[in-house]
Amino acid sequence: MKILRFATLLIICALAGLSMTAENYPSRSDCLWVTNPDHSDWLYETGEDAVISVELYRYGVPVDGVTVKYTIGDDMLPADKEGTLTLKNGRADINIGTMKKPGFRDLRLEANFDGHKFPHHVKVGFSPEKLKPYVKEPKDFREFWAKAVAEDKKFPLTYSAEPVKKYTTDKMSCQLIRLQTTPGGKAMYAYLFIPKGGGKYPAVFCPPGAGVKTIKDPLIHRYYGEGGMIRIECEIHGLHPDLSEEGFASERKARGNYLDMGLDDPDEYYMKDVYLGCRRFLDLLTSLPEWDGKNLFTQGGSQGGALAITTAMLDDRVNGCVANHPALSDMTGYLGDKTGGYPHHFRKNPEEATPEKIRTLEYYDVVNFARHLDCPVRMTWGFNDNTCPPTTSYEVFNVISSPKEALLTPINEHWTTVPTERGHYEWIKSKCK
């Protein structure tokens, strides 16, 4: 197991496309918060107090005498402490206390200038390597999915492909794929990038983040195709990527709550066809004459990170998995009076947690897939993430028993940088046989 830690006071890079341009003040806000835990890695042992220095600059100048409101609470949970502090020459220290159990504490700050609120927050961890998920694994979890995959394989690989000139370069070709995922006609779309040159290449499957939307920025990871890897970037709802924005708006209205659809029955849950459809894309990749016959990877972030893990577990041909802050992890966590993962089922409405819904989520929780991974895994996550909180990312990482490494980027919220994404590519290259 390998863990890399990076702590920083300021975000010093503004990112655009594939280039990185330095700016003195990338946030472009009147106010800049700087919060610096007294442990450089933002990590503490349970029972150990955390002291955080708070700095606030307006137009780059330290503000003096300003009263800052603060609250403190566990990761994604209501505050259990509140107060105010007064900045002296733009600075103050606050002891946020400790935790008796492993987890994260969140210091939430707010300053007001001329009627405008300037919020900020910072999370620090307490023995997070000891975090354990709340979600239970069904006794027949592996049998459920083995049966589902076996049934799915009875349906032959069926897809169409058409060239896409606007995403084709001198080093790679691009095709739009429509992959049929069920005998009844359901489908998923994807862009397939294949290096030019006539060789045999590793293949990488990249599922999408959450939402009902088009395939985002297909060329943002062009260095895969241009660097000698076959790559698929897909969507999961069967929506043509050239559908109009009005069309996507209509679809979002119709199925924006897809992560709740069919939740009373694991065989009827919306995500069953998605999980199986993602695995089916591996059949497509491995059927290509350009595939090298031995290297197959999954890679994604958020919901895509979740699907990278589930797909890798469902197909033992995968020899490497990369996941940024995976969603769909410890989804019933809030029922245990702790942090739960995206999409935060039952956080505000625990009364809706019927035994049927809980049972279904157990079959689809990424934690339970991660327990059974047998390929090398690279993960990355930030501590300040309020979409896929660090608590659940640690829980996923902690249950993985295969070779694993983590890049910890404490200041990150729900994003990664271009260098981090490029690092995934380099890691995949290093794992090729």
Model-based region annotation:
Residues 190-192, 200-210:
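Short beta-strand element of the alpha/beta-hydrolase
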